From Swiss-Prot:
Pfam families: AAA (PF00004), AAA_lid_3 (PF17862), KATNA1_MIT (PF21126), Vps4_C (PF09336). Keywords: ATP-binding, Cell cycle, Cell division, Cytoplasm, Cytoskeleton, Isomerase, Microtubule, Mitosis, Nucleotide-binding. The gene is katna1. It comes from Salmo salar. This is Katanin p60 ATPase-containing subunit A1. Belongs to the AAA ATPase family. Katanin p60 subunit A1 subfamily. Catalytic subunit of a complex which severs microtubules in an ATP-dependent manner. Microtubule severing may promote rapid reorganization of cellular microtubule arrays and the release of microtubules from the centrosome following nucleation.
């Protein structure tokens, strides 16, 4: 989670509210509030915490205002029961009473019925004002769908300039999944798992793993760039399984795939697709794939897939778990990426990651056609990881990254990050040793930012041990040799 993501989600929520799409705005506002709550746990400065709490309250107030608008609109819809369709084209005149309109608005006030031809100049002026005002002011539509182009005669008689503006608005609108027939709460729960339209993680942000990057580009990225080539027998792969020890960068690779493909990115885990109510877990799986097809091209990243799709037929397996696995297998086989008559640019790619590939069901292993190994970083990769982690720190002249990389052989990417974090705190620990809390608060900022020395890294390497054993590496290599598909 980053401040950039929070900022973009706030902009998206406000844009939805301005366009009258209040239900989508509420979903975005709720997501932002949860993101800020999580971010508050990482903030240590009390002054920053107070500022973020104030931001949370302001955004929560905006959310409450949008909810109040929705309740007002719903009350109007319940109270208005016309016996026949309104005489005008859009029926706008019969929705809002005269006293509601206190200022200039894209909606006309209630007037006595007059023939349409007599009010032609007036309606044209109002339609132009409506198109402009709904981008600058908070709209007050009856059903939250004010951004649609005008209908009927008004659409034909509008000025060409207004038609161009409306076309631009419709292109910028974000399409929304119509979950008719499904529980609204289930759809909103899955919408919160859409990380971003663009996770903004590039290949260069990931150290080493050149072979894995090459395979993922061929399996996922190239079909988006060369749709005419990847047809027939060359159709894109249905799914990719990334296998490897913990902390080797499998999640980062998934985000890089979504960024390079410009796809919608679903981050799914076992908690997303499980429910205490009978039958809802299977519905969640089906809704997930229907939403993925709607927002295609889409990348569905299922982390720790072994927790959902372990082997079937074992004594520990529950009936509910078996039904979820069956639905997931059916939906994955139905996605199919792109066949002879389908557009590869509208594919749905299932990207999975696991630390226990030997526990995965055989049918799922067959559907994940590409199975690649994400190993521990090499010596060159460890040096690159050190440079990425230490780019914001001031280092002493005696720091030798090549030597640190040599001493950290067998460490995963997460282990190397922990070593760098621990070493960066060494100077601060030495500075505050033996001081009282009052003296610590009075230390200047310049004194706290001391250079990190080679001795700090050597001490951290002694304190931080490897998280992956040699026996585990042998198991991964044996499995990938038997079932790998690189």
């Amino acid at each position: 989670m980053s401040l950039h993501e929070i900022n973009e989600n706030v902009k998206l929520a406000r844009e939805y509210a301005l366009l009258g799409n209040y239900s989508s705005a509420i979903v975005c506002y709720r997501g932002v509030l949860e993101q800020i709550k999580k971010y508050l746990f990482t903030v240590r400065d009390s002054s920053f915490q107070q500022k973020w709490q104030q931001v949370w309250q302001e955004i929560n107030e905006e959310n409450n205002q949008v909810q109040e608008i929705m309740r007002t609109l719903e009350s109007f819809q319940l109270e208005t029961t016309p016996s026949k369709p309104p005489s005008n084209q859009d029926g706008i005149n019969d929705i809002w009473p005269v006293q509601v309109e206190r200022r200039s608005s894209p909606l006309p006030v209630r007037r006595p019925p007059v023939p349409y031809k007599d009010s032609k100049p007036h309606n044209n002026r109002l339609s132009v004002a409506g198109v402009r005002a709904q981008h600058r002011q908070s709209p007050r539509g009856a059903n939250g769908d004010r951004a649609k182009p005008l209908k009927g005669k008004e659409k034909k008689e509008a000025k060409p300039k207004d038609d161009k503006n409306k076309a631009e608005v419709s292109e910028k609108e974000v399409k929304r999944f119509d979950g008719q027939g499904y529980d609204k709460d289930l759809i909103e729960a899955l919408e919160r798992d859409i990380i971003s339209q663009n996770p903004n993680v590039k290949w260069d942000d990931i150290a080493d793993l050149e072979e894995a990057k090459k395979l993922l580009k061929e399996a996922v990225v190239l079909p988006m760039w060369m749709p005419e080539f990847f047809k027939g027998i060359r159709r894109p792969w249905k799914g990719v399984l990334m296998v490897g020890p913990p902390g080797t960068g499998k999640t980062l690779l998934a985000k890089a795939v979504a960024t390079e493909c410009r796809t919608t990115f679903f981050n799914v885990s076992s908690s997303t697709l499980t429910s205490k109510y009978r039958g809802e877990s299977e519905k969640l799986v089906r809704i997930l794939f229907e939403m993925a097809r709607f927002y295609a091209p889409t990348t569905i990243f299922i982390d720790e897939i072994d927790s959902m799709c372990s082997r079937r037929g074992t004594s520990e397996e529950h009936e509910a778990s078996r039904r979820v696995k069956a639905e997931l297998l059916v939906q994955m086989d139905g996605v199919g990426g792109a066949s002879d008559n389908e557009d590869p640019s509208k594919m749905v790619m299932v990207l999975a990651a696991t630390n226990f590939p030997w526990d995965i069901d055989e049918a799922l292993r067959r559907r994940l056609e590409k199975r690649i190994y994400i190993p521990l970083p090499s010596a060159k990769g460890r040096v690159e990881l050190l440079r990425i982690n230490l780019k914001e720190l001031e280092l002493a002249n005696d720091v030798d990254m090549a030597k640190i990389a040599e001493q950290s052989e067998g460490y995963s990417g997460a282990d190397i990050t922990n070593v760098c974090r621990d070493a960066s705190l060494m100077a601060m620990r030495r500075r505050i040793e033996g001081l009282t809390p009052e003296e610590i608060r009075n230390i200047s900022r310049a004194e706290m930012h001391m250079p990190t020395t080679m001795e700090d890294f050597e001490s951290s390497l002694k304190k931080v041990s490897k998280s992956v054993s040699a026996s585990d590496l042998e198991k991964y290599e044996k499995w990938i040799e038997e079932f790998g598909s690189c």
